[in-house]
Structure formats: C-alpha cells, structure tokens
Amino acid sequence: MSKTEENKYEFGLMLPERYQNGIYLFNQSVPTVDEGLNGTVPEKIRRFNNAASHLVRSILTVEQVYIEGIPILQLCQDVDSVYDNTYRQLIRNVYMELFVYQEKLLNIVCNIFFLEIKKSKQKNLVGLRKRSASFPLLCEFCEQCNQLVQDDKYKRVMSIRDDETHNMSQIDSFVLDLEKTEEGLRIVNKGYRIKAETLRAEYVYAMEKLLQIRNLVQEMLTMYDLRDIYTKLKEQGEEIWVN
C-alpha cells in the first residue's frame, strides 16, 4: 500500500503547539508526581495515538491481504479456503479495534472537558451534553455521536463485533442446508452467511464515520484551551474530574 493510501487512515490526534512546551496538566492541581505526569496533555494524546495505531495496523494488514488475495478468491471454489478464513480473521481484528477506537474517542473528549468517565457510553454523552452550552464544537460532537449510534449500518458493525465477543460469530457463520442422497440426508455447506466483500464494505463505512468524529475532536483540541474550558466549567458550576 502506498504512502498516499496510508495517509487515508489518520486516526491519531496531533498535539496542539500550545501544549508542546513544558508540562501542561489536564488537572489544575495534582496530588502526586505520577498522577501529574499521566495527566499531561501530551501523555493523554500519546496513549490515545497508541490505541489508534492498533486500528491502523489492522486495517493496513487486512487491506494488503485483500489486494493480494483477489485472484485467489476468484479462482478458489472451496467455501472454507485457507485464504478466505485468514482474511476473515483479519477482518475480525478490525471490527474489534473499531470498537476500542470509538471508546477512546469518547474517553479523550471526557478528559478534555473534565468529565468523570462512566462505563455507560450513554451516560458519558449525557454528561458531555450538559457541559456543551459554552462549547459549540462539543455540542456538534454529541450530535454526531448520537447520529452514529442510531445509524443502522454502523449498528450492524457493532452487532457483529458484539457477537464475536460472545462466541456467536457472524463472520464465521455458514449457510447450511439438508440434501437428499442415496445414503440419506446430509448437511451441505453453501458458504459463509456474510460475504467477505460485505464485511469489508461495512468496516470501511464505520471507519469513515469514526474519522469524521476524530476530525472534530482534533478541532476541539486546536480551538479550545484547557484553561478556558476549566474556567467556563467552574462558572457553570460543573464538577471538575480528572481521569
């Protein structure tokens, strides 16, 4: 895959210049050195980008295998070929990493707006929306997240991911039928329930949606100074929480 193609997958966040000199804390007063260093903006973004790199690596790997394997898929008649099986395993990794990336995006926005991170995504979004009165970009972020969770195509991707974690794989599921033979009935494998091309189209769709949200998070980091966020939240009477 060329460098130009790799640049399509800019899932990481850039550190704004204002945070590059000295230690700039998410927290305004930290009780220990360790918590202070882990609370710096560069460290938060480094950890986010590290998580994003897992997704990028998964995508680049599966795309390379896809390009190399198109002729194999066209020639192979085996419904459970080694190539197809391997490709599906790699796609599964992408689906898993998309979910992790979605969580990381929401978490870093909670960091930026000093909101305690809950286990429920919906509770986090409700908390962020409460804080969005003075921050139009945060309001837009909440709207995009709500649209995403209601998007049928995106929900399908997350449904497939959920089934993978609960040992009910849709990716590895076959269409089976019964066929009469002279010896009696036998089970016939008619191929995978979901075609590899469909799985690929769905994760590409989800990836593009998440990139739109990532771009908005980058804009928030660039446009909003954490000191201003802190001051406005205090004025609104919001509780300040450092994750």
Enumerate the language-model features and the residues they cover.
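Acidic, Ser/Thr/Gly/Pro-rich intrinsically disordered interaction regions
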Residues: 1-57, 85-89, 107, 117-243
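Extended, loop-rich substrate-binding clefts of extracytoplasmic carbohydrate-active enzymes
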Residues: 46-75
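Amphipathic alpha-helical interface elements
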Residues: 61-64, 74, 78-118
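Leucine-rich amphipathic alpha-helices with coiled-coil/heptad-repeat character
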Residues: 66-69, 73, 105, 112, ...
